[in-house]
Amino acid sequence: MAERAAIAIAAHPDDIEFTMAGTLLRLREAGWKIHCLNVSSGDCGSLVHGRAALRRIRAAEARRAAAVLGAVHHPSLADDIGILYGLPLLRRLAAVIREVRPAIVLTHPPQDYMEDHTETCRLAVSAAFVRGIPNFASVPRRPAWGGETVIYHAMPHGLHDPLRRRVVAGAWVDTTAVHARKLEALACHESQHAWLRASQGMNSYLRDMERMSRAVGRQSGRFRHAEGWRRHSHPGFSATDADPLRAALGPLCRVNATYERALRRGAP
């Protein structure tokens, strides 16, 4: 059986480590090949370094973090605050999807506290959608791939959407046993310590990740540390009930039965 692949597509170097890395580690333990792609270079995230220097620093940090996770690192495709939904970026991201052929795509939620996250989500969904369309040319050109792929959206920052509404996951992955490795990967992004404190009020980005991990764990009602996910609608991507994350992780992935019942009832 061919090795199955999963890719995390995030806006900035360190976003994957905040909300997705634990799930990647669990998939790797289950025998999957894992990939990391930060769409932007993160070259605006400093009060000290210029853009060119910061671009190099953050690329090196992202490579080190991917190595800690045991993931394939993919180079960034744009600069910071430059993630705009459009054909140039979509064609490049589609090429990555066609190369990786992921059964699982992890990405940001459709609504988050900053537009780079929202635009990255839109691009990831569209790149997955066009993966099997031969007449859509990727850059560089890659053959269309018609395999199934399922998209999972991570939890928004602070577990609230931009309108301050609380967001509850549709499923939780137990990351307790891999939490130390997740922290180690996030700690690779040393350049962000002072920046996140000054720009976003994070006293310590490591402690902030710890708090969110525990909060999602409490939301699960079962796990000490967890990452939460909402599964994207299936048309254009997979069979109706395809859920490869749950299939791969078994009891480490707890489905939110209340969330699923609400979907069946048509509740918001």
Predicted features, each with a name:
Residues 1-100, 130, 242-248, 259-265:
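Active-site rim/loop-helix segments in enzyme catalytic domains that contact anionic ligands
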Residues 1-9, 85-268:
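Metal-dependent de-N-acetylase/amidase catalytic core
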